[in-house]
Curated annotation (Swiss-Prot):
This is Nostrin. Over-expressed in brain microcapillaries from spontaneously hypertensive rats. PROSITE patterns: F_BAR (PS51741), REM_1 (PS51860), SH3 (PS50002). It comes from Rattus norvegicus. Multivalent adapter protein which may decrease NOS3 activity by inducing its translocation away from the plasma membrane. Pfam families: FCH (PF00611), SH3_9 (PF14604).
Length: 502
């Protein structure tokens, strides 16, 4: 069976950081082990410290080169030279470095386990809903098949049955119809619940990612503090360590915690900011032309489902308009706007957009089938290229990949470090680095696009847009009718240079 979690960008982000955290934890434990053994070997210092320096060097070979690892390399050299260190140094290391490190690592391990359990629990909800949808679908398909067989039996035997037999079969058909309606509604509700469980899982991943990132920052700061404590004690051991300590002190003075934290974030950076949510679409018995059913009956069964979807689409569209007005009000009035209200409104907008996209994809799929039955041209919709199928035994399943903004930005620079001119540049408001400058190329809108944020352009099919900059995450920056903003690259096609000159 297809795994609905594999291709999720949130999941990849979280797993990447988790692996990075595990490597950092192992490195921290190796450093702590080295310091503990050094404290135990101070009495027989000369021989024991030499062995320990070798072990520290090996530990450094298996970790990423950065400011901290470079400083610890100098610490290893100082161990080789400091053959006359005494027991007082060992006790100081034990009390001021080893004990606090053990406490921090133990606390972090418990927190990471708690975060993993929370992620696993929400992931199981997504998988369970996915499986429930498939199970409910199979049940509905079987019931529909039996219902159709009973329906055809009644239709074909009307003339040969007595009134009593006919009434008996009609009662049976009525019960079958009621059962079918209940199973259909149950399947529809499970399908609609799919997006909420998916959102909850992705939200949990985002929250746990941020928590784990804070733990990694804490671990890096701990290693830096240990180095500083180590430096202070070494400086007390007299002239015999002066030469060695000058080297290690120089290395430690160059330790830049912010640089290592930035390296951590770059190491776990997202290669692509495009996030695609996979959701199952509702498949029905009457859609498959291989299933035995009269054409008119197929149409009569598909139309109520389309009507139901259209009703939900209209409601979701009204909700979206209301949320857009709320976001505009929050943006324009600072008197009642706050970060939490803005975040809550944006979250609701994301949930509503995902629901609306799912409803429209279901509606497009059914409308295409109905158009084939009525021998009409198939409808056009941007989601047509996002709907896929896979086969499982005697059934085929439809699912849609919906592109959504990735809310977790793993590669962020401090705003205080950015020049004031950059912060006011409209093209820098959307995350992601630029792939190329547009050089004022032109492109033509293939589909209508409704802006969801203030920095986005509204597009109508056929609009000619001037491209100023192309972003690597699938969004371009350009201008239309004097207004500048972002728009999705998938909704336009570039025009050749000659067309632009014409």
């Amino acid at each position: 069976m297809r795994d609905p979690l594999t291709d999720c960008s949130y999941n990849k982000v979280y797993k990447s950081l988790k692996e990075f955290a595990q490597n950092g934890d192992n490195f921290c434990k190796q450093i702590t082990s080295v310091l503990q053994q050094r404290a135990n070997l101070e009495i027989s210092y000369a021989k024991g410290l030499q062995k320990l320096a070798v072990k520290l060097s090996k530990a450094l070979q298996s970790t990423k080169k950065n400011c901290l690892s470079t400083a610890w390399a100098w610490a290893s050299e100082s161990m080789k030279s400091a053959a006359d260190l005494h027991q007082k140094l060992g006790k100081a290391i034990e009390l001021e470095a080893i004990k606090p490190t053990h406490q921090v690592l133990s606390m972090q391990e418990k927190k990471r386990k708690s975060l993993d359990n929370e992620v696993e629990k929400s992931a199981n909800l997504v998988i369970n809903n996915w499986n429930q949808q498939i199970k409910a679908k199979k049940k509905l398909m079987m019931s529909t098949k039996k219902h159709e067989a009973l329906f055809h039996l009644i239709e074909s035997s009307k003339q040969s049955m007595t009134q009593k037999e006919k009434q008996k079969l009609l009662n049976k058909l009525k019960k079958s119809t009621e059962k079918l309606e209940k199973e259909d509604e149950s399947y529809y509700q499970k399908n609609m619940a799919g997006y909420s469980t998916r959102l909850k899982w992705e939200s949990t991943l985002e929250k746990c990612y941020k928590s784990m990132l804070e733990l990694e920052k804490e671990r890096i700061q701990l290693l830096c503090n240990n180095l500083n404590q180590y430096s202070q004690h070494i400086s007390l051991f007299g002239q015999t360590l002066t030469t060695c300590h000058t080297q290690i002190h120089c290395a430690i003075s160059k330790v830049d915690v912010e640089k290592d934290i930035q390296a951590l974030m770059e190491e776990t950076a997202v290669l692509s900011l495009e996030n695609k949510s996979e959701l199952l679409l509702a498949d029905y018995f009457e859609e498959d032309p291989k299933n035995p059913m009269d054409k008119e009956r197929r149409k009569s069964l598909i139309k109520p489902k389309l009507w139901r979807l259209q009703k939900d689409i209209e409601k979701a569209s009204r909700d979206k308009e209301g949320l857009e007005q709320k976001l505009k009000a929050l943006a324009s009035s600072a008197s009642f706007s706050d970060a939490k209200s803005q975040k809550d409104a944006e979250t609701l907008m994301d949930e509503n957009s995902l629901k609306l996209d799912l409803l429209q994809a279901n509606s497009y799929k059914l409308s295409t089938v109905l158009a084939d039955l009525e021998q009409r041209p198939k409808p056009c919709h941007p989601c047509s290229n996002c709907i896929f199928k896979w086969k499982e035994k005697e059934h085929s399943h439809s699912y849609v990949k919906i592109s959504r903004p990735l809310l977790t930005k793993r590669l962020e620079k401090a705003e205080s470090k950015a020049p004031a001119g950059e912060q006011n540049n409209p093209s820098s408001s959307r995350p992601g680095s630029s792939v190329s400058q547009g050089n004022n190329q032109l492109c033509k809108a293939l589909y209508t696009f409704q802006a969801r944020q203030d920095d986005e352009l509204n597009l109508e099919k056929g609009d000619i847009v001037t491209i100023h900059e192309k972003k690597e995450e699938g969004w371009w920056f350009g201008s239309l009718n004097g207004k500048k903003g972002h728009f999705p690259a998938a909704y336009v096609e570039e025009l050749p240079p000659k067309a632009g000159q014409a």
